[in-house]
From Swiss-Prot:
Residues 10-21 have a biased composition (Basic residues). Belongs to the bacterial ribosomal protein bL35 family. GO terms for molecular function: structural constituent of ribosome. InterPro entries: Ribosomal_bL35, Ribosomal_bL35-like, Ribosomal_bL35_CS, Ribosomal_bL35_sf. The keyword S-adenosyl-L-methionine does not apply. NCBIfam families: rpmI_bact. Keywords: Ribonucleoprotein, Ribosomal protein. It comes from Nautilia profundicola (strain ATCC BAA-1463 / DSM 18972 / AmH). GO terms for biological process: translation. Coiled coil: none annotated. This is Large ribosomal subunit protein bL35. The gene is rpmI. SUPFAM superfamilies: L35p-like. The lineage of its organism: Bacteria, Pseudomonadati, Campylobacterota, Epsilonproteobacteria, Nautiliales. Residues 1-21 are annotated as: Disordered.
Amino acid sequence: MPKMKTNRGAAKRFKVKKSGKIKRGAAYRSHILTKKSQKRKRNLRAPKYVDSTNIKAVRELLAI
């Protein structure tokens, strides 16, 4: 049986850390930023991790 292919879109959006957690980018941070407060934008820079309910699905997309 051939190897599973990695979903390339998912590979660009997620990064697996040494601890096994999967890091992701924050939503609401790409455009229409002028109306968002500095505090809100600063908090969006903080690292975000995939929730435990979604880890299995993301791991399948990443073929790991």
